[in-house]
Each structure stands twice: as C-alpha cells, then as structure tokens.
C-alpha cells in the first residue's frame, strides 16, 4: 500500500517536508481555493503538482473535486457544473493525477457534534453524539417533523440536554454541525440549511440515487478517456441526518453504484471510519467483494454505541477489524500483481488523528488533522502492513 497524507495546499500549517518526515510518499490534496462548481484549469493542477514533486513527493489522489448541490438536485446550473466537472477530470488526467476521490452527500459533509472529545489519556478525538444531534435538530433548528426520526428515549435525553445548554454551548454545537469542516463544501445558516434540507427530502432516496447515477453516466466516460479512476467516499456518518437521503452508506449501496455504471473508472474509496460507524457493514467482506474497484483507502477506527453515537478511536483500538481489513487489501494488491496489472499499490491515508502533545496548545489545528496524531496512526498502520506482508510472503513460499 502507498502511504499518503492529506495536505490542504500551500497554506497548510503542516509542510510537505514534515509530511515526508512522517514517512508518507504520496499526497492527497485538492485545489482548495477553487469554488465548488468552477473549472479546474490544467495550469493550476500542474503548478500544485510541481510543488509537491519538488518536495520529493507524489500527488497520488485528488480529494476532492466537490460536486455542486445543483448537480445533486439537477436544478439551476447543473449542466454547466457537470461540463466543468468533466473537463476538470480530464485536466487532472492530463496532468498525471489519476485518482479522484469525491462524495455525493446532500447538504452536509462529514458531521460531528464534538470536535474535542476528551479521551482517558487527555488527548482529544472527534465524536458524533446522537443525543446532541437530536437536540440540535429538534429543539434548535426546529426542523419540521424532526422528532419522528428519533426514538422516544433519544428525544427525552435530547430535551434534557437542550434545556441544560447555555447559549454558548448551543452556538458551539451549531457551529460544529453546520458551519463546515475541513474538506467541506461550504457553510450554512439556520435558515439556509432548512431550505436545503427540504429540497433533498422532497427528492427522496431513490430520486437522489438516480441523480447520482445520472452524474456518473456523464462523468465516467470523461474519466475513462484519460485513465482516471473515480472513487466515491461513503456518507459520514453512514445513516440519515436531518431526514436527508443517504445513498453511499452500506455494501448494498456500493453494489448498486458499481452495477449502475460498470466501468473500471467507477470505483470506491473504502473509508473504514465511515462505513465502520455502522455495525452491519462488514469491512473485511466489502474489501474482498469490491477489491478490484477499490482505488483509495481511509484507515480510521471508531468506537460505536447502540444509539448510533461513536467517537474516533486509536487506529488499532476500535470496533473495526483493522488488521483483517489491511490483510484483505494486501491480498487484493497481490491479486493485481499476479494479474499483471500496473500500479498495484492502493493509496492509503491514516485519515484522522487525535489531537495530542504540543498541538493541544495550538489554536489553528484542523479538526481531525493534527500532525502528531496522524503520524502516530500512520506508524501503527505501517507496522501492521509490514508484519502482514512478511507473513504473506512466508505463506507463499
């Protein structure tokens, strides 16, 4: 597997030199200054690629070219945005960046309620707390019919939690949920998010899924023309929020997507932390079933709770079988090599890391994207990968 690292461009406080020192050889990045829906110019892609290569690294994966909401609803200027997207994919391929991660989540990108959840060792993790989310949805946002989406037990806890919050706590919860997170596509106010939510609720799950398929039928031929692999990121978390349709949450969702557009350029990002937030997603089984269409991997672990809450655990200490998953992915790489395929190594990034050590005192660390926490996770995963590779070679002899 290729060890990669998410870099937020030239303004990232974590330099490419530091990334190389952490042991990564590949960079996962985007043109973060380009507005959602706008065309990625070939010259800009090449310029950022040169910055990365001058540091001795490779731009392995684009994460991401955001999909405009007009495309998701097929309203407004969606056709113009699709044409821009197609040309952006072509330009990326011409520049030599052949893997593009994207998502099709409606309204909100990855969502957490607590960005500084304290762990027993005093480091901090990201957490999704169902009680807090329901408190926001039902009692602060006051979304129409929101209460119908939660159990009586959750509603009772949410009401008690809401009543105990002061205005500062309410503002922080709202900021965490709807104000946008690293890699997100924008921020909302309370009024604008209500309007956006209703638009997607009216569309419904199957209507939204069909819009995703229509998008892929237009984008994938462009990707094929330049040898680009598109790999969709799952919903995070992988269940409905705000009553919104979610169509990349389960193995069955992935199966439908791959079957709808059966092209080698239509693939998956296997995000262990996202899919793994559902106990009914068998990550090892998914790696085996979809292996030949997995082009990018996020290795992150979670500790799940019965009501849907979870927090991001140490990479090797959550509810997901990280060793089994890595083993399945290494077996897929060996299969590709035996079949004579080129570029068999699957790009992997350690995804989020805990906030710890000196970074606890820094004011500008992006939630989930600490240097020390990710370096720790990458080192742990590197040890697993090395041990499994040795065992696989010994078994093959």
Curated annotation (Swiss-Prot):
Pfam hit, one: UxuA
InterPro entries: Man_deHydtase (IPR004628), Xyl_isomerase-like_sf (IPR036237)
Keyword Electron transport on entry: no
Gene3D superfamilies given in the database record: Divalent-metal-dependent TIM barrel enzymes
This protein's pathway: Carbohydrate metabolism; pentose and glucuronate interconversion
Co-factor requirement: Fe(2+); Mn(2+)
Any one Gene Ontology molecular-function term assigned to this protein's record: mannonate dehydratase activity
First-tier enzyme category under EC: lyase
EC numbers: 4.2.1.8
Superkingdom as given in the UniProt entry: Bacteria
Reaction it catalyzes: D-mannonate = 2-dehydro-3-deoxy-D-gluconate + H2O
Keywords: Iron, Lyase, Manganese
SUPFAM superfamilies, per database record: Xylose isomerase-like
GO biological process: D-glucuronate catabolic process
Keyword Lyase: yes
PANTHER family (UniProt xref): MANNONATE DEHYDRATASE (PTHR30387:SF2)
Record family assignment: Belongs to the mannonate dehydratase family.
Reported function: Catalyzes the dehydration of D-mannonate.
NCBIfam families on file: PRK03906.1 (NF003027), uxuA (TIGR00695)
Protein name (Swiss-Prot/TrEMBL): Mannonate dehydratase
Classification of source organism: Bacteria, Pseudomonadati, Pseudomonadota, Gammaproteobacteria, Cellvibrionales
